[in-house]
Swiss-Prot record:
Family in the record: Belongs to the herpesviridae glycoprotein M family.
Organism in which the protein naturally occurs: Human herpesvirus 2 (strain HG52) (HHV-2)
Principal place of residence: virion
Keyword check for Heme: no
Ranges of the Intravirion topological domain: 1-32, 112-137, 185-220, 272-280, 340-467
Subunit structure: Interacts (via N-terminus) with gN (via N-terminus). The gM-gN heterodimer forms the gCII complex.
Gene name tied to this protein: gM
Domain of life of the native organism: Viruses
GO cellular component term of the entry, any: host cell nuclear inner membrane
Protein name: Envelope glycoprotein M
Location of this chain's protein in the cell: Virion membrane; Host Golgi apparatus, Host trans-Golgi network; Host endosome membrane; Host nucleus inner membrane
Pfam families reported in the protein's UniProt record: Herpes_glycop
Bias (Basic residues): 371-381
Record keyword Glycoprotein present: yes
Protein backbone atom coordinates (compact mmCIF):
# COMPACT_ATOMS: atom_id res chain seq x y z
CA UNK A 1 0.00 0.00 0.00
CA UNK A 2 2.25 2.81 1.26
CA UNK A 3 5.51 0.97 0.44
CA UNK A 4 7.83 2.79 -1.90
CA UNK A 5 8.53 1.12 -5.25
CA UNK A 6 12.05 -0.32 -5.68
CA UNK A 7 14.48 1.47 -7.93
CA UNK A 8 14.38 0.23 -11.49
CA UNK A 9 10.77 -0.94 -11.39
CA UNK A 10 8.17 0.46 -13.85
CA UNK A 11 6.42 2.21 -10.99
CA UNK A 12 9.56 4.18 -10.21
CA UNK A 13 9.84 5.58 -13.74
CA UNK A 14 9.76 9.35 -14.25
CA UNK A 15 6.20 9.15 -15.63
CA UNK A 16 4.87 7.38 -12.57
CA UNK A 17 2.28 9.03 -10.29
CA UNK A 18 3.71 11.34 -7.69
CA UNK A 19 0.69 11.34 -5.35
CA UNK A 20 -0.88 8.03 -4.28
CA UNK A 21 -4.32 7.49 -5.73
CA UNK A 22 -3.89 10.12 -8.45
CA UNK A 23 -4.68 7.65 -11.21
CA UNK A 24 -7.82 6.49 -9.40
CA UNK A 25 -8.91 10.10 -8.91
CA UNK A 26 -8.34 10.75 -12.60
CA UNK A 27 -10.56 7.83 -13.60
CA UNK A 28 -13.24 8.93 -11.14
CA UNK A 29 -13.20 12.36 -12.75
CA UNK A 30 -13.57 10.78 -16.20
CA UNK A 31 -16.53 8.68 -15.01
CA UNK A 32 -18.20 11.82 -13.64
CA UNK A 33 -17.76 13.57 -16.98
CA UNK A 34 -19.26 10.57 -18.79
CA UNK A 35 -22.28 10.45 -16.48
CA UNK A 36 -22.76 14.20 -16.87
CA UNK A 37 -22.84 13.82 -20.65
CA UNK A 38 -25.34 10.93 -20.41
CA UNK A 39 -27.58 12.90 -18.03
CA UNK A 40 -27.60 15.95 -20.29
CA UNK A 41 -28.41 13.82 -23.35
CA UNK A 42 -31.23 12.12 -21.43
CA UNK A 43 -32.89 15.39 -20.41
CA UNK A 44 -32.65 16.75 -23.97
CA UNK A 45 -34.08 13.49 -25.34
CA UNK A 46 -36.91 13.58 -22.80
CA UNK A 47 -37.96 17.05 -23.92
CA UNK A 48 -37.82 15.97 -27.55
CA UNK A 49 -39.99 12.92 -26.81
CA UNK A 50 -42.41 15.10 -24.85
CA UNK A 51 -42.80 17.37 -27.87
CA UNK A 52 -43.46 14.37 -30.14
CA UNK A 53 -45.82 12.41 -27.87
CA UNK A 54 -47.83 15.22 -26.38
CA UNK A 55 -50.63 12.92 -25.25
CA UNK A 56 -48.19 11.24 -22.87
CA UNK A 57 -47.25 14.58 -21.30
CA UNK A 58 -50.62 16.33 -20.97
CA UNK A 59 -49.82 18.51 -17.97
CA UNK A 60 -46.52 19.70 -19.41
CA UNK A 61 -47.92 20.78 -22.77
CA UNK A 62 -51.38 21.76 -21.57
CA UNK A 63 -52.35 25.39 -22.09
CA UNK A 64 -52.34 27.75 -19.17
CA UNK A 65 -55.25 27.59 -16.79
CA UNK A 66 -58.27 29.23 -18.36
CA UNK A 67 -60.06 31.52 -15.98
CA UNK A 68 -63.78 31.91 -16.60
CA UNK A 69 -64.96 35.46 -16.99
CA UNK A 70 -66.72 36.68 -13.89
CA UNK A 71 -70.07 38.37 -13.96
CA UNK A 72 -69.55 42.11 -13.75
CA UNK A 73 -72.84 42.65 -11.90
CA UNK A 74 -71.90 40.35 -9.04
CA UNK A 75 -69.91 41.91 -6.22
CA UNK A 76 -66.87 39.81 -5.45
CA UNK A 77 -65.92 39.99 -1.79
CA UNK A 78 -63.23 37.33 -1.43
CA UNK A 79 -62.37 33.73 -2.21
CA UNK A 80 -59.33 31.57 -2.80
CA UNK A 81 -57.53 32.19 -6.09
CA UNK A 82 -56.11 29.63 -8.47
CA UNK A 83 -52.28 29.36 -8.48
CA UNK A 84 -50.57 31.36 -11.18
CA UNK A 85 -48.52 29.46 -13.75
CA UNK A 86 -46.42 30.28 -16.76
CA UNK A 87 -47.72 29.90 -20.28
CA UNK A 88 -46.65 26.82 -22.23
CA UNK A 89 -44.22 28.57 -24.58
CA UNK A 90 -42.31 30.29 -21.77
CA UNK A 91 -42.11 27.14 -19.65
CA UNK A 92 -40.89 24.92 -22.48
CA UNK A 93 -38.42 27.54 -23.70
CA UNK A 94 -36.95 27.74 -20.18
CA UNK A 95 -36.63 23.96 -19.97
CA UNK A 96 -35.11 23.72 -23.46
CA UNK A 97 -32.53 26.45 -22.81
CA UNK A 98 -31.57 24.88 -19.48
CA UNK A 99 -31.10 21.41 -20.98
CA UNK A 100 -29.09 22.83 -23.89
CA UNK A 101 -26.78 24.69 -21.52
CA UNK A 102 -26.28 21.54 -19.44
CA UNK A 103 -25.34 19.63 -22.58
CA UNK A 104 -22.93 22.40 -23.61
CA UNK A 105 -21.31 22.30 -20.16
CA UNK A 106 -20.90 18.53 -20.43
CA UNK A 107 -19.27 18.85 -23.84
CA UNK A 108 -16.99 21.55 -22.44
CA UNK A 109 -15.88 19.17 -19.68
CA UNK A 110 -15.09 16.50 -22.27
CA UNK A 111 -13.03 18.96 -24.32
CA UNK A 112 -11.19 19.98 -21.16
CA UNK A 113 -10.36 16.33 -20.52
CA UNK A 114 -8.81 16.07 -23.98
CA UNK A 115 -6.77 19.29 -23.80
CA UNK A 116 -5.59 18.58 -20.25
CA UNK A 117 -2.86 16.34 -21.65
CA UNK A 118 -0.62 19.13 -22.87
CA UNK A 119 2.53 17.00 -22.59
CA UNK A 120 3.23 13.43 -23.60
CA UNK A 121 5.12 12.55 -20.42
CA UNK A 122 2.41 13.86 -18.10
CA UNK A 123 1.59 11.97 -14.93
CA UNK A 124 -1.93 11.45 -13.66
CA UNK A 125 -1.62 13.96 -10.83
CA UNK A 126 -0.67 16.85 -13.10
CA UNK A 127 -3.26 15.90 -15.69
CA UNK A 128 -5.95 15.69 -13.01
CA UNK A 129 -4.97 19.16 -11.80
CA UNK A 130 -5.23 20.50 -15.35
CA UNK A 131 -8.59 18.77 -15.87
CA UNK A 132 -9.97 20.19 -12.64
CA UNK A 133 -9.25 23.65 -13.99
CA UNK A 134 -11.85 22.91 -16.67
CA UNK A 135 -14.47 21.51 -14.27
CA UNK A 136 -13.95 20.35 -10.66
CA UNK A 137 -15.60 17.32 -9.06
CA UNK A 138 -18.20 19.39 -7.19
CA UNK A 139 -19.30 21.10 -10.40
CA UNK A 140 -19.72 17.74 -12.14
CA UNK A 141 -21.83 16.41 -9.27
CA UNK A 142 -24.02 19.53 -9.34
CA UNK A 143 -24.45 19.18 -13.10
CA UNK A 144 -25.54 15.54 -12.81
CA UNK A 145 -28.02 16.31 -10.03
CA UNK A 146 -29.35 19.33 -11.93
CA UNK A 147 -30.04 17.28 -15.07
CA UNK A 148 -31.80 14.47 -13.20
CA UNK A 149 -33.96 16.86 -11.17
CA UNK A 150 -35.14 18.53 -14.38
CA UNK A 151 -36.11 15.14 -15.79
CA UNK A 152 -38.04 14.32 -12.62
CA UNK A 153 -39.87 17.65 -12.88
CA UNK A 154 -40.99 16.91 -16.43
CA UNK A 155 -42.16 13.40 -15.51
CA UNK A 156 -44.09 14.65 -12.48
CA UNK A 157 -45.81 17.28 -14.59
CA UNK A 158 -46.70 14.55 -17.08
CA UNK A 159 -48.41 12.61 -14.27
CA UNK A 160 -50.23 15.73 -13.01
CA UNK A 161 -48.42 15.79 -9.67
CA UNK A 162 -48.13 19.55 -9.67
CA UNK A 163 -47.10 20.36 -6.10
CA UNK A 164 -44.26 17.81 -5.99
CA UNK A 165 -43.14 18.89 -9.46
CA UNK A 166 -42.81 22.50 -8.34
CA UNK A 167 -40.89 21.42 -5.24
CA UNK A 168 -38.45 19.38 -7.34
CA UNK A 169 -37.99 22.32 -9.70
CA UNK A 170 -37.07 24.59 -6.78
CA UNK A 171 -34.36 22.06 -5.84
CA UNK A 172 -33.27 21.99 -9.48
CA UNK A 173 -32.97 25.78 -9.47
CA UNK A 174 -30.86 25.70 -6.30
CA UNK A 175 -28.52 23.14 -7.90
CA UNK A 176 -28.35 25.26 -11.05
CA UNK A 177 -27.32 28.33 -9.04
CA UNK A 178 -24.61 26.31 -7.30
CA UNK A 179 -23.47 24.86 -10.64
CA UNK A 180 -23.09 28.29 -12.25
CA UNK A 181 -21.36 29.84 -9.23
CA UNK A 182 -18.95 26.94 -8.69
CA UNK A 183 -18.23 26.71 -12.41
CA UNK A 184 -17.20 30.37 -12.34
CA UNK A 185 -15.07 30.24 -9.18
CA UNK A 186 -13.87 26.59 -9.12
CA UNK A 187 -13.96 26.89 -5.35
CA UNK A 188 -10.75 28.95 -5.13
CA UNK A 189 -9.93 32.59 -4.47
CA UNK A 190 -9.83 35.02 -7.36
CA UNK A 191 -6.08 35.60 -7.06
CA UNK A 192 -5.36 31.86 -7.13
CA UNK A 193 -7.73 31.47 -10.05
CA UNK A 194 -5.95 34.12 -12.13
CA UNK A 195 -2.48 32.78 -11.31
CA UNK A 196 -3.44 29.25 -12.29
CA UNK A 197 -4.98 30.35 -15.58
CA UNK A 198 -2.06 32.63 -16.51
CA UNK A 199 0.40 29.89 -15.60
CA UNK A 200 -0.84 27.82 -18.56
CA UNK A 201 -0.07 30.41 -21.24
CA UNK A 202 3.42 29.13 -22.06
CA UNK A 203 3.33 25.38 -21.24
CA UNK A 204 -0.23 24.66 -22.48
CA UNK A 205 -1.62 27.36 -24.81
CA UNK A 206 -4.48 25.17 -26.09
CA UNK A 207 -5.64 24.24 -22.61
CA UNK A 208 -5.26 27.89 -21.60
CA UNK A 209 -7.77 28.89 -24.29
CA UNK A 210 -10.22 26.32 -22.93
CA UNK A 211 -9.91 27.34 -19.27
CA UNK A 212 -9.58 31.04 -20.14
CA UNK A 213 -11.64 32.66 -22.92
CA UNK A 214 -13.89 29.65 -23.62
CA UNK A 215 -14.60 29.25 -19.93
CA UNK A 216 -15.60 32.92 -19.73
CA UNK A 217 -18.13 32.38 -22.52
CA UNK A 218 -19.51 29.29 -20.80
CA UNK A 219 -19.78 31.20 -17.53
CA UNK A 220 -21.84 33.90 -19.23
CA UNK A 221 -24.08 31.26 -20.80
CA UNK A 222 -24.67 29.38 -17.54
CA UNK A 223 -25.41 32.59 -15.65
CA UNK A 224 -27.81 33.64 -18.41
CA UNK A 225 -29.68 30.35 -18.02
CA UNK A 226 -29.67 30.67 -14.23
CA UNK A 227 -31.18 34.17 -14.26
CA UNK A 228 -33.66 33.07 -16.92
CA UNK A 229 -34.84 30.27 -14.63
CA UNK A 230 -35.67 32.76 -11.88
CA UNK A 231 -39.07 33.27 -13.52
CA UNK A 232 -39.99 29.57 -13.34
CA UNK A 233 -38.48 29.28 -9.84
CA UNK A 234 -40.52 32.24 -8.57
CA UNK A 235 -43.68 30.73 -10.07
CA UNK A 236 -42.90 27.37 -8.41
CA UNK A 237 -42.34 29.00 -5.02
CA UNK A 238 -45.53 31.01 -5.45
CA UNK A 239 -47.47 27.86 -6.37
CA UNK A 240 -46.20 25.99 -3.31
CA UNK A 241 -47.23 28.91 -1.11
CA UNK A 242 -50.64 29.18 -2.80
CA UNK A 243 -51.34 25.46 -2.33
CA UNK A 244 -50.58 25.67 1.39
CA UNK A 245 -52.08 29.07 2.23
CA UNK A 246 -55.26 30.85 1.23
CA UNK A 247 -54.20 33.50 -1.26
CA UNK A 248 -56.48 35.93 -3.00
CA UNK A 249 -55.92 36.91 -6.63
CA UNK A 250 -54.12 40.21 -5.88
CA UNK A 251 -52.02 38.50 -3.21
CA UNK A 252 -50.98 35.94 -5.81
CA UNK A 253 -49.66 38.66 -8.11
CA UNK A 254 -47.91 40.55 -5.31
CA UNK A 255 -46.33 37.39 -3.88
CA UNK A 256 -44.99 36.33 -7.28
CA UNK A 257 -43.56 39.78 -8.00
CA UNK A 258 -41.90 39.97 -4.58
CA UNK A 259 -40.30 36.53 -4.86
CA UNK A 260 -39.06 37.24 -8.36
CA UNK A 261 -37.60 40.62 -7.41
CA UNK A 262 -35.78 39.12 -4.41
CA UNK A 263 -34.27 36.34 -6.53
CA UNK A 264 -33.11 38.64 -9.33
CA UNK A 265 -31.69 41.36 -7.09
CA UNK A 266 -29.87 38.85 -4.88
CA UNK A 267 -28.28 37.01 -7.80
CA UNK A 268 -27.23 40.20 -9.57
CA UNK A 269 -25.61 41.50 -6.38
CA UNK A 270 -23.71 38.21 -6.03
CA UNK A 271 -22.56 38.52 -9.64
CA UNK A 272 -21.35 42.08 -9.16
CA UNK A 273 -19.84 41.52 -5.74
CA UNK A 274 -18.19 38.09 -6.08
CA UNK A 275 -18.23 36.52 -9.53
CA UNK A 276 -16.98 39.61 -11.36
CA UNK A 277 -13.53 39.13 -9.79
CA UNK A 278 -13.16 35.87 -11.73
CA UNK A 279 -14.69 36.85 -15.08
CA UNK A 280 -14.69 40.58 -15.75
CA UNK A 281 -17.01 40.71 -18.75
CA UNK A 282 -20.34 39.37 -17.50
CA UNK A 283 -23.37 40.39 -19.56
CA UNK A 284 -25.18 37.03 -19.65
CA UNK A 285 -26.86 37.25 -16.23
CA UNK A 286 -28.26 40.70 -16.94
CA UNK A 287 -29.75 39.56 -20.26
CA UNK A 288 -31.27 36.56 -18.52
CA UNK A 289 -32.76 38.78 -15.82
CA UNK A 290 -34.37 41.08 -18.39
CA UNK A 291 -35.81 38.10 -20.30
CA UNK A 292 -37.14 36.58 -17.06
CA UNK A 293 -38.80 39.90 -16.20
CA UNK A 294 -40.65 39.76 -19.50
CA UNK A 295 -41.78 36.18 -18.81
CA UNK A 296 -43.12 37.07 -15.36
CA UNK A 297 -44.79 40.19 -16.71
CA UNK A 298 -46.54 38.17 -19.42
CA UNK A 299 -47.78 35.63 -16.87
CA UNK A 300 -49.08 38.39 -14.60
CA UNK A 301 -50.89 40.07 -17.47
CA UNK A 302 -52.61 36.81 -18.46
CA UNK A 303 -53.61 36.17 -14.85
CA UNK A 304 -54.93 39.71 -14.41
CA UNK A 305 -56.86 39.56 -17.68
CA UNK A 306 -58.56 36.30 -16.70
CA UNK A 307 -59.56 37.50 -13.23
CA UNK A 308 -59.88 41.21 -13.91
CA UNK A 309 -63.07 41.84 -11.93
CA UNK A 310 -61.89 39.76 -8.97
CA UNK A 311 -58.53 41.53 -8.77
CA UNK A 312 -59.97 45.02 -9.18
CA UNK A 313 -62.68 44.38 -6.61
CA UNK A 314 -60.39 42.93 -3.96
CA UNK A 315 -57.40 45.26 -4.46
CA UNK A 316 -57.85 48.10 -6.95
CA UNK A 317 -54.62 49.17 -8.60
CA UNK A 318 -52.68 46.03 -7.64
CA UNK A 319 -51.74 45.29 -11.24
CA UNK A 320 -50.36 48.80 -11.67
CA UNK A 321 -48.06 48.26 -8.71
CA UNK A 322 -46.96 44.92 -10.17
CA UNK A 323 -46.11 46.58 -13.48
CA UNK A 324 -44.11 49.31 -11.78
CA UNK A 325 -42.21 46.76 -9.68
CA UNK A 326 -41.32 44.65 -12.72
CA UNK A 327 -40.23 47.77 -14.60
CA UNK A 328 -37.95 48.69 -11.70
CA UNK A 329 -36.47 45.18 -11.71
CA UNK A 330 -35.73 45.44 -15.43
CA UNK A 331 -34.23 48.90 -14.95
CA UNK A 332 -32.07 47.60 -12.11
CA UNK A 333 -30.80 44.75 -14.30
CA UNK A 334 -30.03 47.19 -17.12
CA UNK A 335 -28.21 49.56 -14.75
CA UNK A 336 -26.15 46.70 -13.35
CA UNK A 337 -25.26 45.66 -16.90
CA UNK A 338 -24.02 49.16 -17.70
CA UNK A 339 -22.06 49.24 -14.45
CA UNK A 340 -20.50 45.85 -15.17
CA UNK A 341 -19.46 46.84 -18.70
CA UNK A 342 -17.99 50.13 -17.48
CA UNK A 343 -15.97 48.50 -14.72
CA UNK A 344 -14.75 45.76 -17.06
CA UNK A 345 -13.63 48.35 -19.63
CA UNK A 346 -11.75 50.36 -17.00
CA UNK A 347 -10.07 47.23 -15.67
CA UNK A 348 -8.89 46.04 -19.09
CA UNK A 349 -7.73 49.53 -20.05
CA UNK A 350 -5.80 49.96 -16.81
CA UNK A 351 -4.04 46.61 -17.19
CA UNK A 352 -3.78 46.92 -21.01
CA UNK A 353 -4.89 43.34 -21.60
CA UNK A 354 -5.12 41.57 -24.93
CA UNK A 355 -8.90 41.86 -24.76
CA UNK A 356 -8.62 45.64 -24.61
CA UNK A 357 -6.14 45.72 -27.51
CA UNK A 358 -8.41 43.60 -29.70
CA UNK A 359 -11.40 45.74 -28.78
CA UNK A 360 -9.50 48.92 -29.65
CA UNK A 361 -8.35 47.52 -33.00
CA UNK A 362 -11.89 46.42 -33.81
CA UNK A 363 -13.18 49.90 -33.05
CA UNK A 364 -10.56 51.48 -35.33
CA UNK A 365 -11.42 49.10 -38.16
CA UNK A 366 -15.11 49.88 -37.71
CA UNK A 367 -14.42 53.63 -37.88
CA UNK A 368 -12.32 53.13 -41.01
CA UNK A 369 -15.07 51.14 -42.71
CA UNK A 370 -17.64 53.75 -41.74
CA UNK A 371 -15.54 56.56 -43.22
CA UNK A 372 -15.13 54.62 -46.47
CA UNK A 373 -18.87 54.12 -46.70
CA UNK A 374 -19.55 57.80 -46.06
CA UNK A 375 -16.99 58.92 -48.62
CA UNK A 376 -18.41 56.56 -51.24
CA UNK A 377 -21.92 57.87 -50.53
CA UNK A 378 -20.73 61.48 -50.93
CA UNK A 379 -19.01 60.56 -54.20
CA UNK A 380 -22.13 58.87 -55.54
CA UNK A 381 -24.28 61.91 -54.67
CA UNK A 382 -21.87 64.21 -56.52
CA UNK A 383 -22.07 62.06 -59.62
CA UNK A 384 -18.43 61.01 -59.68
CA UNK A 385 -16.93 57.59 -59.07
CA UNK A 386 -17.06 56.48 -55.45
CA UNK A 387 -13.29 56.12 -55.25
CA UNK A 388 -11.29 55.37 -52.17
CA UNK A 389 -9.85 58.60 -50.71
CA UNK A 390 -6.63 58.56 -48.83
CA UNK A 391 -8.13 59.74 -45.55
CA UNK A 392 -10.44 56.72 -45.48
CA UNK A 393 -7.61 54.50 -44.34
CA UNK A 394 -6.52 54.72 -40.75
CA UNK A 395 -3.04 53.73 -39.65
CA UNK A 396 -4.41 51.42 -36.97
CA UNK A 397 -5.58 48.82 -39.46
CA UNK A 398 -2.06 47.66 -40.28
CA UNK A 399 -0.29 48.42 -37.02
CA UNK A 400 -0.08 45.71 -34.42
CA UNK A 401 -0.58 46.36 -30.75
CA UNK A 402 3.19 46.18 -30.23
CA UNK A 403 3.90 49.18 -32.46
CA UNK A 404 4.15 52.66 -31.03
CA UNK A 405 1.45 55.09 -32.13
CA UNK A 406 1.89 58.80 -31.65
CA UNK A 407 -0.78 61.23 -30.55
CA UNK A 408 -1.91 61.91 -34.13
CA UNK A 409 -2.43 58.25 -34.93
CA UNK A 410 0.74 57.70 -37.02
CA UNK A 411 3.10 54.84 -36.37
CA UNK A 412 6.84 54.58 -36.79
CA UNK A 413 6.50 52.73 -40.09
CA UNK A 414 6.87 53.96 -43.68
CA UNK A 415 6.58 57.67 -44.46
CA UNK A 416 3.28 58.95 -45.74
CA UNK A 417 4.80 60.76 -48.74
CA UNK A 418 7.75 59.37 -50.72
CA UNK A 419 8.65 62.63 -52.49
CA UNK A 420 8.17 66.10 -51.03
CA UNK A 421 7.91 69.02 -53.47
CA UNK A 422 10.23 72.03 -52.81
CA UNK A 423 8.72 74.97 -51.02
CA UNK A 424 9.36 78.15 -53.12
CA UNK A 425 7.97 80.48 -50.49
CA UNK A 426 10.40 79.17 -47.87
CA UNK A 427 13.29 79.77 -50.28
CA UNK A 428 12.11 83.33 -50.98
CA UNK A 429 11.85 84.10 -47.25
CA UNK A 430 15.37 82.77 -46.75
CA UNK A 431 16.70 85.17 -49.39
CA UNK A 432 14.93 88.13 -47.83
CA UNK A 433 16.32 87.36 -44.40
CA UNK A 434 19.88 86.88 -45.76
CA UNK A 435 20.39 89.42 -48.59
CA UNK A 436 23.34 88.88 -50.82
CA UNK A 437 24.32 87.86 -54.29
CA UNK A 438 22.43 84.93 -55.70
CA UNK A 439 24.93 82.32 -56.87
CA UNK A 440 24.58 81.07 -60.40
CA UNK A 441 21.25 82.76 -60.89
CA UNK A 442 19.86 83.66 -64.26
CA UNK A 443 19.34 87.40 -64.98
CA UNK A 444 15.82 88.63 -64.61
CA UNK A 445 15.92 90.85 -67.72
CA UNK A 446 18.21 90.00 -70.61
CA UNK A 447 17.37 92.84 -72.98
CA UNK A 448 16.48 95.90 -70.96
CA UNK A 449 16.78 99.03 -73.16
CA UNK A 450 16.33 101.77 -70.58
CA UNK A 451 18.42 103.93 -68.34
CA UNK A 452 19.05 102.72 -64.78
CA UNK A 453 21.03 104.64 -62.13
CA UNK A 454 24.19 102.95 -61.02
CA UNK A 455 25.07 102.38 -57.42
CA UNK A 456 28.47 102.75 -55.88
CA UNK A 457 29.00 99.04 -55.93
CA UNK A 458 28.67 96.40 -58.56
CA UNK A 459 25.85 96.77 -61.06
CA UNK A 460 22.72 94.84 -60.29
CA UNK A 461 22.23 93.72 -63.87
CA UNK A 462 25.30 92.87 -65.91
CA UNK A 463 23.58 93.17 -69.29
CA UNK A 464 22.08 96.68 -69.02
CA UNK A 465 23.17 98.96 -71.87
CA UNK A 466 24.00 102.61 -71.21
CA UNK A 467 23.00 105.34 -73.54
Amino acid sequence: MGRRAPRGSPEAAPGADVAPGARAAWWVWCVQVATFIVSAICVVGLLVLASVFRDRFPCLYAPATSYAKANATVEVRGGVAVPLRLDTQSLLATYAITSTLLLAAAVYAAVGAVTSRYERALDAARRLAAARMAMPHATLIAGNVCAWLLQITVLLLAHRISQLAHLIYVLHFACLVYLAAHFCTRGVLSGTYLRQVHGLIDPAPTHHRIVGPVRAVMTNALLLGTLLCTAAAAVSLNTIAALNFNFSAPSMLICLTTLFALLVVSLLLVVEGVLCHYVRVLVGPHLGAIAATGIVGLACEHYHTGGYYVVEQQWPGAQTGVRVALALVAAFALAMAVLRCTRAYLYHRRHHTKFFVRMRDTRHRAHSALRRVRSSMRGSRRGGPPGDPGYAETPYASVSHHAEIDRYGDSDGDPIYDEVAPDHEAELYARVQRPGPVPDAEPIYDTVEGYAPRSAGEPVYSTVRRW
